[in-house]
Amino acid sequence: MTDAQPILVTAAILVDGDRILVCQRHHSDRYGLQWEFPGGKVRVGEDLKVALRRELVEELAIEADVGEEVFRLRYRYPDRYVEVVFLAVRSFRGTLENRVFEAVEWAPRPALPSYDFLEADRELVRRIARGEIV
């Protein structure tokens, strides 16, 4: 794959005390049943925070108060190249409703590494579990 520019994606690190919201990809999706943070592709010309708010409404039916950038990575999967910008979310309005995932859980921070996360997210997961991020 020789893509010069990565696909821009934004994802939320939703924090509730010592718990982090994690989402399991639907079994029929690419990388099915692996865990990730909610979010999605940024549209051309779209602000990162606006994109994440839109994705969280679509995926979880919440209106998020999107905060600061906490981590950024680039990762080359066999079939695509992505740049993921992770933004903190410490509050939201509405009741969480799983609209697209196999499962959604509030995971205790220390337990995060026990989930089978997407390869690209694993270093971030370790850093969150150690309390280095958010």
Walk through the language-model features, giving the residues of each:
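Conserved N-terminal beta-strand and adjoining loop/helix that marks the start
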Residues: 1-21, 41
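Short coil/turn segments
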Residues: 25-28, 62, 117
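A conserved beta-turn-beta hairpin within the catalytic core of GNAT-like acetyltransferases
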Residues: 29-34
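The catalytic Nudix box helix
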Residues: 37-69, 108
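Active-site-adjacent beta-strand/loop module that shapes the phosphate/pyrophosphate-binding cleft
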Residues: 63, 73-96, 103-106, 128
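C-terminal structural segments of small proteins and small subunits
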Residues: 93-94, 109-122
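Charged phosphate-binding loop/patch that engages nucleotide di/tri-phosphates or the phosphate backbone
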Residues: 120-134
